[in-house]
């Protein structure tokens, strides 16, 4: 039975019903709808709309329904109800008769769905926080295990300066920490209860909305009924936070795809997260990482979708807002599986230390060290930069690394170069000189890991 039939004399078009019904999407709010309805039963009992006995009967029936649906979730979609609110109310009336018709007194589907959705976001958000913390822990463990594995660092996808794999891991630890903070902030802002706002002007019954918020584990009630029923900032923020986190996951995936490639071969991925080719027997494809990278686009799409849906809506509720859930649910599902998959990828990752070290020793990644050496001898950096560029051109022509030039050859570029230049050109020296907060020197990496583990 529709919740709004009295105003209408004609039959609803079957096509319109298919177009209008949201149960195939919002069935996921079932538990939140029941929990909110239990709290609402207490609220209307507190102002005398129902008796204590009626309240107890309603709550018992709602809890029975909760158990029944948990045992057979297919009941919901088989009902043919318009939405999850209609399903719960119809099932309640089937259990307790006309008493079930009293539950919606003073309540609108507008504040009801806003409450359901915030409850769902709080629950799923906390689960996502746990997943982010799991990723953080896995990255930190990998950083500790491979803190001294030397590899090339890149700019413009060209070898730039040597770093360590531990330093690379710590970069994503920092990103993940920001994601954790961002999600926690979003959940704090969303921790307000819209229930009691009615359709748009507030409920007509003078109930204690602070008590109602407390009953539903919200920090406080919302303060403006118009805003309460039309606010979807929590959906936007959750999608935005997911998009930023997915961007970080996608960048990490791209790095690892390259590191795993035959052209780099710095790492190997476990068989658990790779697949083969139907034609080429030798292939071992990084499909888990590619799917993380690919799913990032659909998460972005949902963020743009909800922003576009909301951008021109007048206050208060509009049916457009029914479109808030499908994208949100997909965002949360995609983000969750990508976080789980990232942990699985990292847990089985092996670093090919010889190949990574060899790559770091090539590509003239020690050029900056030669420039710094010239600066230490009194040459202005800009001049030193130019001189070293000339040395690199000559080295490329001879197909040798910088350290293979004889001292006499180096002096043709700068007479101030002495024998003590050679220790400065080693990989070890390149790393050791970056002994500053945030740098790639091994002591800095160890200190950073220890500091993060101590939190």
From Swiss-Prot:
Listed GO molecular functions? argininosuccinate lyase activity
Q: At the top level of its lineage, which domain of life is listed?
A: Bacteria
Q: List the catalysed reactions.
A: 2-(N(omega)-L-arginino)succinate = fumarate + L-arginine
Which keywords label this protein?
Answer: Amino-acid biosynthesis, Arginine biosynthesis, Cytoplasm, Lyase
Q: In which pathway does it act?
A: Amino-acid biosynthesis; L-arginine biosynthesis; L-arginine from L-ornithine and carbamoyl phosphate: step 3/3
Lipid biosynthesis as a keyword?
A: no
What PROSITE patterns does the database record attribute to this sequence? FUMARATE_LYASES (PS00163)
- Subcellular location(s) per record: Cytoplasm
Q: What is its EC number?
A: 4.3.2.1
Keyword Cytoplasm assigned? yes
One of its GO biological process terms is: L-arginine biosynthetic process
Instruction: Name which cysteines form disulfide bonds.
Output: none
UniProt-listed Pfam families: ASL_C2 (PF14698), Lyase_1 (PF00206)
Homology family? Belongs to the lyase 1 family. Argininosuccinate lyase subfamily.
From the Swiss-Prot or TrEMBL record, give the protein name.
Argininosuccinate lyase
């Amino acid at each position: 039975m529709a919740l709004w039939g009295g105003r209408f004399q004609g039959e609803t078009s079957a096509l319109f019903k298919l177009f209008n019904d949201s149960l195939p999407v919002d069935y996921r709010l079932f538990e939140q709808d029941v929990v909110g309805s239990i709290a609402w039963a207490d609220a209307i009992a507190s102002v005398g709309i129902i008796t204590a006995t009626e309240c107890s009967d309603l709550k018992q029936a709602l809890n029975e329904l909760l158990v029944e649906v948990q045992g057979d979730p297919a009941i919901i979609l088989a009902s043919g109800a318009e939405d999850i609110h209609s399903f719960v109310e119809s099932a309640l009336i089937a259990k307790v008769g006309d008493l079930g018709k009293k539950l919606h007194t003073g309540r609108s589907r507008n504040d009801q769905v806003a409450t359901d959705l915030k409850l769902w976001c709080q629950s799923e958000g906390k689960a996502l926080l746990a997943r982010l913390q799991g990723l953080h822990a896995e990255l930190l463990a990998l950083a500790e295990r491979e803190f001294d594995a030397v590899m090339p660092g890149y700019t413009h996808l060209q070898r730039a300066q040597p770093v360590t794999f531990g330093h690379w891991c710590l970069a994503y630890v920092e990103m993940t920490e920001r994601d954790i903070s961002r999600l926690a902030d979003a959940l704090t802002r969303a921790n307000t209860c819209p229930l009691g706002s009615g359709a748009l002007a507030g409920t007509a019954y003078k109930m204690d909305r602070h008590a109602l918020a407390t009953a539903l584990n919200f920090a406080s009630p919302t303060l403006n009924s118009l805003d309460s029923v039309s606010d979807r900032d929590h959906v936007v923020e959750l999608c935005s936070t997911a998009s930023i986190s997915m961007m970080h996951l996608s960048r990490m995936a791209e790095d690892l795809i390259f590191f795993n490639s035959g052209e780099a071969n710095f790492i190997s991925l476990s068989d658990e997260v790779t697949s083969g080719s139907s034609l080429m027997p030798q292939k071992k494809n990084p499909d888990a990482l590619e799917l993380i990278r690919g799913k990032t686009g659909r998460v972005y799409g949902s963020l743009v979708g909800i922003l576009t849906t909301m951008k021109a809506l007048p206050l208060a509720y509009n049916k457009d807002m029914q479109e808030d859930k499908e994208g949100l649910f997909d965002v949360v599902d995609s983000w969750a599986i990508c976080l789980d998959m990232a942990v699985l990828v990292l847990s089985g990752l092996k670093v090919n230390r010889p190949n990574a070290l060899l790559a770091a020793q090539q590509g003239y990644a020690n050029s900056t060290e030669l420039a710094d050496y010239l600066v230490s001898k009194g040459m202005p950096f800009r001049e030193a930069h130019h001189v070293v560029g000339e040395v690199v051109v000559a080295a490329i022509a001879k197909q040798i690394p910088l350290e293979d030039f004889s001292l006499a050859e180096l002096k043709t570029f700068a007479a101030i170069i002495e024998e003590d230049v050679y220790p400065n050109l080693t990989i070890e020296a390149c790393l050791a000189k970056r002994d500053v907060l945030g740098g790639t020197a091994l002591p800095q990496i160890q200190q950073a890991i220890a500091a993060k583990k101590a939190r």
